[in-house]
């Protein structure tokens, strides 16, 4: 009953159902048979089309049990949950630094290779990621494409808008696993955690004194 009767003429992979073979063959042909009636975009798989259509409908069926934030797809929820758990499963083979996302690790590894494949046509500055180049380019154009629907203030980066909107909503999605205190920004949580660990990562190049906060180091440097 487990015999696989339908084989791919390109790679030889076998399938029990003809429909499975048909879907698989699209990975070779590049055929995109599923069409979004809203925007005209095509997809290889029906599941990809359904996921895409949520952007049009606003449906976000995947909810974080920690903070209630909702997501269009399950993989984004899993990435978000790592912000609460602190899980960083992807480690750099060069320096050991760990990351929650593989894409962030891959971008980080270019620091070691020195590769900066995306360069600004205005000033020639190079960037590791294309999105960093796009953000940088707005410093030349002055474009601020992300407006706040509450107050109208505009931002050059989507993350700046997300952080700003928390000043309206009061949302604090980043919780300390030690004491439960919540923060609006992940960087504030990271800073807070140093109080539990006693870690002081900012050291004075003049005298070697260490500090838990960069602002404390900067204030200290003025004494030299």
Curated annotation (Swiss-Prot):
InterPro entries tied to this protein: Znf_C2H2-type (IPR050758), Znf_C2H2_sf (IPR036236), Znf_C2H2_type (IPR013087)
Signal peptide region: none
Annotated SMART domains: ZnF_C2H2
Family of this protein: Belongs to the krueppel C2H2-type zinc-finger protein family.
Domain of life: Eukaryota
Protein name as catalogued: Oocyte zinc finger protein XlCOF6.1
Organism the protein comes from: Xenopus laevis (African clawed frog)
Cellular-component GO terms for this entry: nucleus
PROSITE patterns: ZINC_FINGER_C2H2_1, ZINC_FINGER_C2H2_2
Pfam families reported in the protein's UniProt record: zf-C2H2, zf-H2C2_2
One MF term in the entry's GO annotations: zinc ion binding
Location relative to the cell: Nucleus
Zinc finger (C2H2-type): 6-28, 34-56, 62-84, 90-112, 118-140, 146-168, 174-196, 202-224
Coiled-coil region(s): none
Keyword terms: DNA-binding, Metal-binding, Nucleus, Repeat, Transcription, Transcription regulation, Zinc, Zinc-finger
Protein purpose: May be involved in transcriptional regulation.
């Amino acid at each position: 009953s487990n015999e696989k009767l339908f084989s791919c003429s390109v790679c030889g992979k076998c399938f029990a159902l003809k429909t499975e073979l048909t879907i698989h063959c699209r990975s070779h042909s590049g055929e995109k048979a599923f069409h979004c009636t809203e925007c005209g975009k095509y997809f290889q798989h029906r599941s990809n089309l359904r996921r895409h259509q949520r952007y049009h409908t606003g449906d976000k069926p995947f909810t974080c049990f920690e903070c209630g934030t909702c997501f269009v797809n399950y993989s984004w929820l899993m990435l978000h949950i790592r912000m609460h758990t602190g899980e960083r499963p992807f480690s750099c083979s060069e320096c050991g630094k760990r990351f929650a996302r593989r894409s962030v690790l891959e971008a980080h590894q270019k620091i070691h290779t020195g590769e900066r494949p995306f360069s600004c046509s205005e000033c020639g500055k190079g960037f590791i990621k294309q999105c960093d180049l796009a953000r940088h380019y707005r410093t030349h154009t002055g474009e601020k494409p992300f407006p706040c629907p509450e107050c109208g203030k505009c931002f050059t980066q989507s993350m700046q808008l997300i952080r700003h909107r928390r000043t309206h909503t009061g949302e604090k999605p980043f919780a300390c696993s030690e004491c439960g205190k919540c923060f609006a920004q992940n960087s504030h949580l990271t800073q807070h955690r140093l109080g539990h660990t006693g870690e002081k990562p900012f050291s004075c190049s003049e005298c070697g004194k260490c500090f838990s906060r960069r602002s404390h180091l900067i204030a200290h440097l003025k004494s030299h």
